[in-house]
Regions:
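Catalytic center-proximal scaffold of phosphoryl-transfer enzymes
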Residues: 1, 23-27, 90-92, 100-315
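Short, conserved DNA-binding cores of transcription-related domains
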Residues: 1-90
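Short cysteine/histidine-rich zinc-coordinating motifs and their immediately flanking basic loops
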Residues: 57-65, 95-103, 244
Length: 315
């Protein structure tokens, strides 16, 4: 079997496409494998709209980055023709290994999307040997295609929270469908506060959900979030997220500890002991500190008990 035939099998090429030649460039680092694809003279190609085989003309050369061949970067080059279909006119054909307008093969893009779920895009770009700007174009394309298929007509409850995405007070607000166990994230936008809720409202309307269908919203205690939910989702009951309630009370316990430590000596291990839940693993020093705090008249011990009594709410 010829080397070109082996490469054709590996690429999954079907007629009229075949591997015409191959060349390994060892002068570049990393080395580059170049495969030239084409067809026999006079071959016909399918119309990209109806699939009817038509005569080819007006060839133009394109190159695509493919998955590595062993440790070598691999590139596919082909002269891609136009066809004139009696029904749909003259159009450039769509090659089976890449989507229109992309400089990467479909298999390369598939790997990029898998990696982008697990690591920063800049890291993916360094790993595959290209720029993050080029990869962002790939990611944005597939995200946009996926968003076209999103149906939120049955949305009844959602949760939202902001998280810092970069240094310098830059935030992203994320919205999740509380009834979804698999892939619950349904919207994310830069920024935080009231404007993000308005953008989310516009998004779900475009995806088939009327805001009055939403009956429950889970949020933190941000005043801007609460005001926005009351304005844009008037039928929804607002629930404060358990994590933020505990966070508020934990901060209050720490404030009591700081104030009391200025008036009297506290047991060693108090600082980190009171920041942990009763069921959370502690060092022996922390456990002994909590026991002493609760057995004697320490204000910090009283505050800690109040915080721990919140657990019945969750049950």
């Amino acid at each position: 079997m010829r080397t070109e035939d082996i490469f054709a099998l590996g690429l999954g090429l079907t007629p009229p496409w075949q591997v015409l030649s191959q060349r390994l460039d060892t002068e570049k680092t990393p080395h580059e494998l170049h495969l030239v694809l084409g067809a026999d003279r006079g071959a016909t190609y399918p119309c990209p709209t109806c699939g009817r085989n038509c005569k080819a003309h007006d060839f133009e050369e394109f190159t695509w980055r493919h998955l590595n061949f062993f440790q070598h970067h691999c590139y596919l080059t082909a002269r891609v023709p136009r066809v004139t279909c009696p029904k749909h006119g003259t159009r450039r054909i769509v090659v089976p290994w890449a989507r229109p307008g992309s400089n990467f093969t479909l298999l390369f893009e598939q790997v990029v999307m898998i990696l982008a779920r697990e690591m920063p895009v800049a890291t993916v770009a360094s790993f595959v040997g290209t720029t993050d700007k080029r990869l962002w174009r790939v990611i944005n394309h597939y995200v946009a295609e996926a968003m076209k298929r999103v149906d939120l007509s049955r949305l009844k409850a959602f949760g939202l929270d902001e998280t810092a995405c970069k240094r310098g007070q830059r935030y992203v607000t994320i919205f999740i469908d509380l009834d979804r166990e698999d892939r619950p994230v349904i919207f994310a936008t830069e920024g935080k506060g009231k404007q993000t809720v308005q953008l989310f409202r516009e998004h779900i309307i475009s995806k088939g959900c009327h805001p009055n269908r939403v009956l429950e919203v889970v949020s933190d205690m941000s005043g801007s979030f609460i005001a926005a939910v009351e304005e844009h989702f008037p039928q929804a009951d607002l629930t404060v997220d358990w994590f933020h309630v505990v966070q508020l009370f934990t901060t209050a316990v720490d404030e009591v500890r700081k104030a009391e430590s200025k008036e009297r000596a506290l047991p060693k291990g108090t600082r980190w002991g009171v920041l942990k839940g009763r069921e959370t693993a502690k060092t022996q020093t922390q456990a002994e500190a909590l026991q002493e705090l609760e057995s004697e008249a320490f204000a910090t011990g009283i505050a800690y008990r109040v915080k721990e009594q919140l657990r019945w709410i969750r049950r």
